[in-house]
């Protein structure tokens, strides 16, 4: 196991990590990032609003590099895709699974990934 991982293994809290999620997202700039999750269902494993806030906070780095951010800092209603920028976000009602966001991810990714004509469906 990586030695640095052991520093954060155990009874530590979020405040013990020396970086925040928006900094990790900003490190991806200027590359596209799709952030998705299910609605919070009381299990404590999903923090959709926190995910959104991190995506929005990474926006200035994307803009600095000439790319588009989320386009808003207002948390959207569930099932509302924000996919016009280079950072994308969508929250679904399907629980703790990525499957309901796949169609939206594919729509977002299609702007960046182009299949050769011979492999495209006709």
Question: Residue spans of the language-model regions?
Answer:
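Mobile cap/lid helix-loop segments that gate and shape the active-site cleft of serine hydrolases
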Residues: 1-24, 47, 51-74
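Aromatic-enriched hydrophobic runs in primary sequence
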Residues: 14, 21-25, 32-33, 53-56, ...
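N-proximal short alpha-helices
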Residues: 24-27, 78
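Short, proline-enriched alpha-helix->beta-strand connector loops that line the catalytic pocket
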Residues: 27-33, 82-87
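Hydrophobic alpha-helix feature that most strongly marks membrane-spanning transmembrane helices
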Residues: 28-29, 33, 38, 63-67, ...
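Conserved strand-to-loop "acid loop" that flanks and positions the catalytic carboxylate
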Residues: 29-48, 91-95
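C-terminal catalytic histidine-bearing segment of alpha/beta-hydrolase fold enzymes
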Residues: 56-57, 62-122
């Amino acid at each position: 196991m990586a030695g640095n991982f052991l520093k954060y293994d155990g009874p530590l809290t979020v405040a013990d990590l020396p970086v925040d999620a928006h900094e990790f997202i900003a490190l991806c700039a200027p590359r596209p990032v799709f952030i998705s999750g299910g609605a919070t269902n009381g299990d404590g494993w999903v923090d959709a609003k926190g995910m959104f806030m991190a995506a929005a906070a990474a926006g200035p780095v994307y803009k600095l590099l000439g790319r588009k951010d989320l386009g808003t800092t207002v948390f959207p209603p569930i099932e509302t895709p924000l996919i016009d920028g280079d950072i994308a976000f969508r929250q679904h009602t399907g629980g703790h699974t990525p499957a309901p966001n796949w169609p939206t991810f594919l729509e977002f990714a299609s702007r960046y990934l182009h299949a050769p004509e011979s492999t495209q469906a006709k």
